[in-house]
């Protein structure tokens, strides 16, 4: 899905650009319980996220500056930054902060809400519903997100994806824990999840 596609439909308000035009570590926990919705009807509640803080974060793709691969992350806030990793998986981030800062939030897990048949068809046979979107690579596969979605405007009316506030508040009194799947920056407590949610990829060790 790209420009010209129908707008995603989900009850609630599409998050405005101002929501994303802030420090990634502020945006990330407030994305919990928001809805990632696709124009084809697939939708899931965001239950796990990680923040990446650009030039001050050795684990960020943008730590060493702008390249053709990470250029989207340096663009305006409120867009998807989709990248290929380990030669086999796509991961998706929301670009945050002012244009040029190279910061964003990795969406790590969704609780599937709608369009489960499409999600199941996109994932390997026999995948349990709990595992459809439990992890960053799984959720992109289930939601139909790949390289073609890099740069999609989440606020644009017809770019295929949006993040929607359906009135569900983020969990209260959240504490961050260390990010996972990285080798540097592991001391930074920039991973958050919905406590007790069975769709989270792994428990957050609070610090």
From Swiss-Prot:
SUPFAM superfamilies the UniProt entry points to: FMT C-terminal domain-like (SSF50486)
Catalytic activity, EC: 3.2.2.-
GO molecular function: alkylbase DNA N-glycosylase activity; DNA binding
Highest taxon, organism lineage: Bacteria
Keywords for this protein: DNA damage, DNA repair, Hydrolase
Any GO BP annotation: base-excision repair
InterPro entries referenced in this protein's UniProt entry, alphabetically: Formyl_transferase-like_C_sf (IPR011034), MPG (IPR003180), MPG_sf (IPR036995)
Family: Belongs to the DNA glycosylase MPG family.
Protein name (database record): Putative 3-methyladenine DNA glycosylase
Organism: Burkholderia lata (strain ATCC 17760 / DSM 23089 / LMG 22485 / NCIMB 9086 / R18194 / 383)
